[in-house]
């Protein structure tokens, strides 16, 4: 597999050893978070993104290897697999080139060329292709027999054979492919019979659209493909025909004459009928794959920022799911998110609002509420304005994305079988304020609403990427072994749903964990799983203080040696800058433990179990604006980032319609990625630059802001 290591290393700008060691660790069953955190010496301190890229490329290599074996078996069955051909196949690591090699041997439906061969026209095709015969029509007369009635039919059949030979020429296919790489244009046209339909207007920007394929960004390409799938657009990928046919004719035409003319016609036929449709499909697929990859990257970044959003922590919360006609669903939760109270409070009308405020105030006093969570759906702004009149209690607006999915789920029904799903939704909103990560892992990541075109991309790849992101975030934060739900534990490195259930069952039967060593008593949780999960599980007030840190149990002896050298207990070493400064890390370097791990341990001992998530901040919309009619160009307003795409960021400014900051308006400098400037749910200050009342669109800017 050495050659595969070289290819992966070169494509990712890594060393061959890094790739080899990482693949070995993955093959041994270690998870990406575990490898990134606890095997830095083996990988050369690769991060999770790099390890995931190696894993992805290694899987592609395995698939390519399987394809090679299938191709060799198929050609061998035809008794055409020569040693040279086998070596050529084995040396090829490009999927398109491999299929080009296989093309002449690939079983295919009965083609025009096969019919011509069955009619005995292959010798005539070879004569014409040699281009030495001056009178091919006369030679064609010798082939008039059976199904061939005229010399013209014989020549036509011979040209079909020549066209197929040309179309299976891997060098020619690569030349055409290179032209497409450089020059391909993507064109979309409206389907005339449907252009007046209301739904078609969503794609009006692409009714007559042309752009170089290599410059067509992912959101445009996905929008075009969505319009095509819906039946409103006709889409093609094309190049100037002459650029390709000239290259083909340059190789196959020698001199002048009737044979040369026939070969020239066969070249054009080969391109138009056989090569172009195949290469166009190939580029349609590869451009869609590239757009999917870019879009999935945007979705995973959005999800990561949602999962790692600032938690309120263990405080008593009143959560409100706003409603106008049906009233607000109100719940009160204790510090652990347990339900204390639920009711409905109506807020429509001045007198009702006065009564509602009194009801809200009573609940906050009765249940000692420390914070209020308001869902960001219908009537959110109006409800928030009422709740802000509560003295001394911060009010936070919380995204409702996915709350309705959770409230209707089997898990929610099991926990609250007697409650209406709207009440369950309000509970989810409150818990999301307390700990976004712990609550969001309960629902399918795709339900959270992570991107505009998430339903247009490859769903298998999207699920893999989102699941990997959830796993990464859960392990980055760490999990309280004694309070975590099954859903949260399931994403811990080495566990999964089955072992997570066993941990919860053990907790119910034996009470809280007091040591990581107790993991070995959990049913079916063996040494391998224990090794992978232990470092990511936290036990507050454990017998061993290291059990509430990210220090892995396999490194406890090392920390104990550090403490012994400082003449103190491990508990005295933790959080003591003076003692930690005195430790000479170089003295503890071994063949297995290098400076990367030692630095991580020291950092963890300084602040054990430090939550990497930022501090939660209260936010207020501008009191001057409540609807789009209140806006005017030039207004400067506070807002919250609600979604990030590769073309910009959507901002909630409190008018029931998000505004868009185009990527060109995000900064005073050129940027490639909006994530360089903004993060999901970040509080920003924006300027209104355009308002389209008819289409309900608001254009915003963050350029030229005063520092």
Show which residues each predicted segment covers:
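A glycine-rich phosphate-binding loop feature that marks nucleotide/adenosyl-phosphate handling sites
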Residues: 178-185, 320-324, 377-382, 398-405, ...
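Structured, non-catalytic alpha/beta "coupling" segments that mediate domain-domain communication
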Residues: 74, 88, 99-101, 229-240, ...
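Single-stranded RNA-binding regions, centering on S1/OB-family and related RNA-binding modules
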Residues: 539-707
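Duplex nucleic acid-engaging cores and interfaces of nucleic-acid transaction enzymes
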Residues: 50-52, 60, 64-74, 78-319, ...
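Generic start-of-chain signal for non-secretory N-termini
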Residues: 1-20, 27
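Long, highly charged, low-complexity intrinsically disordered interaction regions
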Residues: 4, 62-80, 90, 405, ...
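Short, ordered loop/turn segments at secondary-structure junctions
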Residues: 38-40, 129, 240, 322, ...
